């Protein structure tokens, strides 16, 4: 499964998006774009990414830019997995 697909699956499961997750693209906005994507969802998504990839994400690595779009989050996840 590629990184974008993994991120979409995590978002689908975390935010209970159901079939709406299939419409997400790399350009789909997260912050301000999905009402379900609030501060608690950010924490849950980060935890699921850490568990899924076996990585640790430090607080200072996170910014609004990481969560701007599905693609920006997937790029961040890809970089963490490669490190």
Tell me the role of every PLM-derived stretch.
Residues 1-37, 41-46, 51-52, 56-83:
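Phosphopantetheine-dependent thiolation modules in NRPS/PKS and related acyl-activating systems
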């Amino acid at each position: 499964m590629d990184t974008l697909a993994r991120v979409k699956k995590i978002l689908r499961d975390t935010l209970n998006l159901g079939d709406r997750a299939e419409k997400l693209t790399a350009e789909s906005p997260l912050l301000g774009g999905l009402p379900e994507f609030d501060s608690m969802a950010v924490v849950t998504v980060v935890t699921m990414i850490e568990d899924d990839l076996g990585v640790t994400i430090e607080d200072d690595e996170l910014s609004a830019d990481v969560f701007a779009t599905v693609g920006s989050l997937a790029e961040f996840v890809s970089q963490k997995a490669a490190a």
